[in-house]
Each structure stands twice: as C-alpha cells, then as structure tokens.
Amino acid sequence: NAKNISVNCQINANNNGLHTIQKYKNPNLVLINESEMRNEMRDKDSPSRLLIKRLAKHLKARNVIVTQGNEGALFYNTKLKKFIKAPAFGSIIKDKVGSGDLFLSIFSIINSVTENAELALYTGSLCAAETLKEFGNSNILTKEQLEKLVIYNLK
C-alpha cells in the first residue's frame, strides 16, 4: 500500500468518453481539468466548487485540484473543507502538452514534503506555466531557475 496516491486522468482524442477517473478510489490527490471534471460528472452548468465537492465525495479523495486554463487552478481539501485558488501564470501559450503532468509532479512532491498545499499549488502552477512557453520539452527548468521564478513571483 502506497502512502500517497495521486491520480491524473486525462481525456484525449483516443479515449474521449471511454475512460473514467471513478475507478480510482481513496486517492490522496486527484488532478483534473475543468472540462474533464464536467465530462466525468455529466454536468456542464453547475458551479465548479460544487462539482469539485461532489467529485471528492464520490471518489473519497482527500484533495482535488481542478485546473481551469487562464483562470488558474482550484484546490480543495476535504478534511479542512477549504478551497485555495492559484492564478494562471501562463501568458505565452505555445504547447499545453505535459503541463498537467508537470503540475501534478511538482505539487505532489512539495505537498508531501512540506504539507503546505498553498505553496505546492503556487509552485506547480508556476512550473506548468513555464512549460507552455515552448514546444515539447526543449526548455527544461533547472532548480536555480525555479528558485528565481518563485522568489520573483512572491514579490
């Protein structure tokens, strides 16, 4: 049994409507984008926060993050019944592929080490925004670049 289970379940052209995040139960963290969540919940009109709570309850997830494109990301902790909003940092968007994967990786690592969801959400959003600027993985973010990025944006 793993201590922390994070799930990122994506819709793409090959599996639209054929996959579901609902087969994963009791995850520590679910990362899903707004349209994937609405598809999963079969609800295009309800407020995001209501759908996030419903999804968390159904999956018995401790934490849910919904990425919302240029609206940023919304984190929900079921134990604290608390939402945290992170802004969108990406102003230059060339390629979205991999940004959610990086977001999940950075968030999961920082949150498991620090238990500071706000810092993890913020840093994950910053890193994901950096991946949007280039096609593919031609621009790999170093530790030093990440530190400068976080410090600059905290000011």
Language-model-derived ranges and their functions:
Residues 40-42:
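Short active-site loop/helix that positions an aromatic residue
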Residues 37-38, 113:
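A short, structure-level motif marking secondary-structure boundaries and short turns
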Residues 34-36, 89-90:
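Short, histidine-centered active-site or binding-site loop motifs used for metal coordination
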Residues 1-6, 11-26, 45-155:
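Conserved phosphate-binding/catalytic region of the ribokinase-like
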Residues 26-35:
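Non-cysteine beta-strand/loop elements that form the S-adenosyl-L-methionine
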